[in-house]
Amino acid sequence: MKIGVTGSDHICDRIQKTLEKRMPDLEVVYRRSNDYRYGLEAAAQFQKGKVSGIIFTGPTNYHYALKRLEPNVPWTFLPHNQASILK
């Protein structure tokens, strides 16, 4: 399975460390930016790249992209708390 993750460097780093430990067989592609508007471009690239799903690092970049692009794979975002990546 291939998952796309988009968001800030800081949160992507945490997600990457967690997923490498807990789900080493999962293929993850990262698109990093500290500008929430980049989530739209990242989502479009991920969908063209045939990912199975997209994780946004927060609600702002998720909702911004969702208003402008129709998902063709499952999308979700992480709430802003420390344990959210573990759920």
Listing of model-derived features with the role each one plays in the protein:
Residues 1-87:
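Alpha-helical/coil-rich non-catalytic "connector" segments in signaling and regulatory proteins
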